[in-house]
UniProtKB/Swiss-Prot annotation:
EC annotation from Swiss-Prot or TrEMBL: 5.4.4.2
GO biological process: pyochelin biosynthetic process; salicylic acid biosynthetic process
Protein's gene: pchA
Reaction(s) the record says it catalyses: chorismate = isochorismate
Protein name: Salicylate biosynthesis isochorismate synthase
Length: 476
């Protein structure tokens, strides 16, 4: 179908696809994955997010310049736990795809995310977010370039009613163009204060201790993160994304709902993308502010490029990615020196990395090899993670962890969930971190985290959702 057909035609096509899948399920005596996709008229997936998010149904919004989608409803959830979570999901996904019934231009796909560290501390506000949770969404609305599509997915079981399944999905398609629920903005809180003087001193003391550990040779780099917990008004997550879209067009936008909590952000960092056997990633480490004018901006950027401390920190990330990708690659392309990635408030050292993969083994094995890179964990990985578990004093949850999608043809894309916040009823948790090496300065690193927190604070404040007064909670 070139465009979403009239209801009767859509119902007939979906019924036929579901009948094939149910018949195959009966023959195999096990459930069978079914995916049916159609072209539709232009439609912004963000507006569907705004119309459909009911604050309980699992869903995920994702936006980059080349691809945006809203995935709603969980037809199947693949979970993994502990150190083998990536491998377990990969194994189950391959089994499902082997017998899948597919109709239309799109392959079956999963979307979701992972905890930063399954062995790390756990707090109640992250309870709904598993070690690994990738869902087969019932309905996904996509914009890819100039193409707009909808993907219907289900796990067909022997004896199911194909007509009832088709009618259910058609009824959802009829709601695609419902208007988004927009809540009026309350009073804007304006510029948000950061941590108290005592909390700042506590944070800088943690940084100082970590830097001392680097100098003592315990590890070459460690990343410490901190969180701010703030009272939160009654806001629509999609409106936060709408604001981030306007202010941070160069970032990767995401929002993932589990239960009554929504984790969202505007990340500058891709972990890895696979398309047609080619892997694309980058090393992103080393940070400085943007300038007030073009001349100051150029001066600050050059200072970052000339900084021995930041170049050393950056090179640790480059070498870790090289080591992780080499076993999977026929060709690995890494520039000799970094460039700059300029964002709205900060600029980073950035080295793009490409790999021609040796086989079609899938993206989850690359996630396991890459995560966490030294940009969000440290180097060496094991020693840095042990230090974070013992000294950071917070549950990162899905912060700084892989979040994205993969399909049944070996393609996929996962970002690193940075510049983010977890929204729960009545309160929001904002996250930021910084990489520490032997000559890091606590006051400078504190200011860096303030810059990184500012994007999400400003977005929440702009729609009237953030209270000026921090909750009385330690900053880590």
């Amino acid at each position: 179908m070139s465009r979403l057909a009239p209801l009767s035609q859509c119902l007939h096509a979906l019924r036929g696809t579901f009948e094939r899948a149910i018949g195959q399920a009966q023959a195999l005596d096990r459930p069978v994955l079914v995916a049916a996709s159609f072209e539709i008229d232009p439609l912004d997936p963000l507006q569907v997010f705004g119309a459909w998010d009911d604050r309980q149904t699992p869903c995920l919004y994702w936006e980059q310049p080349e691809l945006a989608f809203f995935a709603w409803g969980c037809a199947l959830e693949l979970q993994g736990h502990g150190e083998q979570r990536f491998a377990r999901i990969e194994e189950n996904w391959q089994l499902l795809c082997a017998d899948a019934v597919v109709e239309g231009p799109l392959a079956p796909r999963l979307c979701g995310g992972f905890r930063f560290d399954p062995r790390g501390p756990r707090e109640e506000h992250w309870q709904a977010f598993a070690d690994a949770s990738l869902m087969l969404a019932g309905i996904t609305v996509l914009r890819e370039g100039e193409r707009y599509r909808v993907l219907c997915q289900h796990l067909a079981k022997p004896g199911e009613d194909a007509l009832a399944l088709a009618a259910y999905h058609c009824s959802a398609l009829l709601r695609l163009r419902q208007p988004a629920r927009r809540r009026p903005s309350g009073p804007t809180a304006g510029a948000q204060g950061d941590a108290s003087a005592q909390e700042r001193r506590q944070w800088e003391a943690k940084v100082s201790d970590a830097v001392s550990s680097v100098r003592q040779g315990r590890f070459g780099k460690v990343v410490l993160a901190r969180t701010q917990a703030r009272p939160l008004g009654d806001i629509e997550p999609w409106q936060v994304i709408e604001h981030l879209r306007l202010q941070h067009a160069d970032a990767q936008l995401f929002a993932c709902r589990r239960g009554n909590a929504c984790f969202l952000g505007a990340s500058p960092e891709r972990l890895v993308r696979i398309r047609a056997g080619e892997a694309l990633t980058h090393a992103l480490a080393g940070t400085i502010a943007r300038g007030g004018d073009a001349q100051e901006d150029a001066r600050l950027g050059q200072a970052l490029l000339d900084s021995a401390k930041d170049r050393h920190e950056h090179q640790l990330v480059v070498e870790a990615i090289r080591t992780a990708l080499e076993p999977f690659s026929e060709v690995l392309e890494i520039p000799d020196a970094p460039g700059l990635k300029r964002l709205a408030r900060v600029q980073h050292l950035n080295t793009p990395i490409r790999a021609r993969l040796a086989d079609a083994g899938g993206i989850l094995r690359l996630l396991q090899a890459l995560h966490p890179t030294p940009a969000v964990g440290g180097y060496p990985r094991s020693a840095a993670l042990d230090y974070i578990r013992q000294h950071e004093g917070m549950d990162r949850g899905w912060y700084a962890a892989p979040l994205g999608w993969l399909d049944g043809e070996g393609n996929g894309d996962f970002l690193v969930a940075l510049r983010s916040a977890l929204l729960t009823p009545g309160r929001g948790y904002l996250f930021a971190g910084c990489g520490l090496v032997g000559d890091s300065e606590p006051a400078h690193e504190y200011r860096e985290t303030c810059l990184k927190l500012s994007a999400m604070r400003e977005a929440l404040s702009a729609i009237g959702g953030l209270d000026e007064v921090p909750l009385q909670r330690g900053v880590a």
